[in-house]
Amino acid sequence: MARAKWPVAGLVAVAMAATLAAGVRAWAVTDEDVTRAVDEGRQVLLAQQSQDGSWTEEKYHGALFACGHTEMALYTLLYIGEHPNSEAIRKATDAMLARPTDYTYALSWRIMALAKLQEKLTEGLRDRAREELKKSVAVLVGGQGAHGGWDYRPIRASGYPAATQARFDLSNTQMAILALWEASQAGIEIPTSVWQRAQTLYLRLQHTDDGSWNYGDPNNMDHGANSPGYGSMTAAGLATLFITSDLLEPGSGCPCGPGRSAKARGDMNRRIDAALKWMEVNFTPDANPQCIDPTWMRLYWLYSVERVGMASGYQYFGAHNWYQEGAQSVLSTSWRTLPDLCFAMLFLYKGRAPVLYNKLQFKGEWNNHRRDIANLTSYIIKAKEQLFQWQIVGLLAPMEELHAAPILYITAETPPEFSEADKKKLREFTDTGGTILFEASCGNPAVRAWFKTFAKEVWPEWALKPLGPEHGSFLDPYRLRQRPEIFGLDDGLRTFLFYAMDDVSCAWSLKSVASREYLFRWGINLYTYATDYSPLRAKLETADSAKPSERYATPIQVGSRQRVTLARLKYDGPWATGRQYQPMERLTQFLRDRSFLTLDADEAGLEAKDLKKEDVALLVGGGGELTMSAENLEALKAYLGRGGFLWVESAGGSADFDKAVRKLAEDAGWELKPIDKTHALLTGQFPTAVGYNVATGVEFRRALRVVRLGRAYAELVGIYHNGKLIGIHSPFDILFSLTGYEAYGLRGYKVEDAMAVAVNILLYVSDPPALP
């Protein structure tokens, strides 16, 4: 695409935040910076719209009609969230459809805008958009030359013979292919020959020495002919191959043979890998690499990088995080033309999409079904009408990057060669709230045997068990009549590992929606289960991006005692439920940061008969198992008689454990009574200490939001003996809730309120009211 100045009164730019000034690290850019820039860019686009709905146009390369600024602006506004029924969109659509276009770029952007419009319009307007879409697609398809490429104007309309000598270039061609792909996603049928001709052209023109592409025009000595490949054309060429290979050769490695994948087409994979290697070696966000003029079409280059990153799942090209570095570069740049502004907006907006699945790269056969998660993600995008992406990660990545997606997907066709450090990393991932989906690719028997040993080694506390039809991953949001056979590791709070001993990924790779849609729906159910419907983070958001809670606005005041000791009780049953998530470490750190109260917590597990001078005995469990020997029950009663305090919690808000606690209280001769909202445990007002007021304004996790309407206070049950409060029982989850991790159907508090309730319990122990 040739250079073009956008004739506006002043400089089109979005101001960079002060923190992003020159010299600041690339990862200083935040999602807040990105969303602010996108909104400002949207305002600039709207401000430059003419009264008739169009944008200022230019004509290039002998085109009879406008070049496509209006089409490009319309598509960009639709993509970044401008409502399709707004006046600006309505006027822009009318202006676009009121004029003809014979310019390939304009026609391509028109098709993409119409495809986007028809997704969102009401029935009558949608029908109009679809008819116009069909007409434009027919023109663009007819404009392809026999060699597979496109010129600035449709080749037949330009007077060229529909033969291999007609002029073309790969910039026009990649735009046409992108537009036709968008149309195909909107349900418009594109002749297979269109993709075949284009793919053949790209394979013919790829530089076999380094995997790159140039402009492709044999008569352009600077950018085409035999000149070296450069950034924007290589990224666009690679994105085009992803499109054509997905359409022409779906299901690389599928269907499965006995325990092994089908032989993939090695040539196409090698071509794609060569181009990806070029991207790794040459990526820079600040220039169009290897171009004669590196400043030329730099934002076009970054837009193409985003397309490759999203299609390939690569978060990094070499050592470069393409979105982080690209976003900082874009936000540091003045956008002087309408195309620059649109490319910048599309890069920023599309690249920040939340990540649904991370696919693990490891030493071994990890990618025999190369497009499995890519195709599943595409299905979910359509089903949810929301933009998502997927990524490839390795175990050398920081834990924060592994947690960028709710699911870590591991598929292996040979036993992975995990080091001891790798195994510890995977255990740390699940212990910090992560969820793993492991597949024995094609049901490989060697991987099946290896996995059983591996699971016992890394997660020895739990046994693999088949998931029954009532498991949440089979019910929500889709109630699956047909289900894959899945095993799981469940810790009493959540299933943190899902194991498919038979192949599920070939259905995704082959896009077998018609015959095996239940597997695609299970992919939606799975991330829903892992997140409990919590919103996913945008690309540059981190776990600590949330604004500080007003819950902690009032500082904690400690009473006369500044140290509390706590021990977790061991009993016959799941006494260690939730321990691996280290809630006590978080609670200890919170108190250290915000008060002078020191918590010494021993979670190794003590039987009641071994309790001595601990201030608090913590009794946690999930399910209905709570069996304590007569010796330990008497020891617990004696401990409480000496002034100890019992903190009982139904992990996950388990109703069955709540019943077991009531049976234990009956056996021990204790009385259970609800704690009144005026009690210090809820008001946070102790004799000398001050905690948090959880008698009002308390927020709950999803499973309790409706049932607690009108009851926005913490719920604690007092454990009494002879009228004295000797402990509390929480029927709702506190400890797991305060970690901030997610568990499907968890009956607990939002993070801040869970922490506040826990703090109040400890403050009560450190500063109890005087006995009457």
Where are the regions that the model predicts?
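Bacterial N-terminal signal peptides that target proteins for export
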Residues: 1-13
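Bacterial N-terminal signal peptides
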Residues: 10-22
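An alpha-helical repeat/solenoid feature that recognizes helix-turn-helix modules
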Residues: 27-40, 54-88, 99-196, 204-325, ...
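Structural recognition of the beta-strand scaffold that forms the well-ordered cores
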Residues: 75, 110-112, 141, 149-151, ...
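Solvent-exposed loop/turn segments at secondary-structure junctions
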Residues: 80-83, 101-104, 116-119, 146-148, ...
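Short alpha-beta junction capping motif
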Residues: 167-169, 407-448, 616-658
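Aromatic-Pro/Gly-enriched surface loop or interdomain linker
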Residues: 350-407, 411-414, 504, 511-616, ...
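An acidic, glycine-rich "communication" segment
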Residues: 444-531, 542, 549-550, 562-565, ...
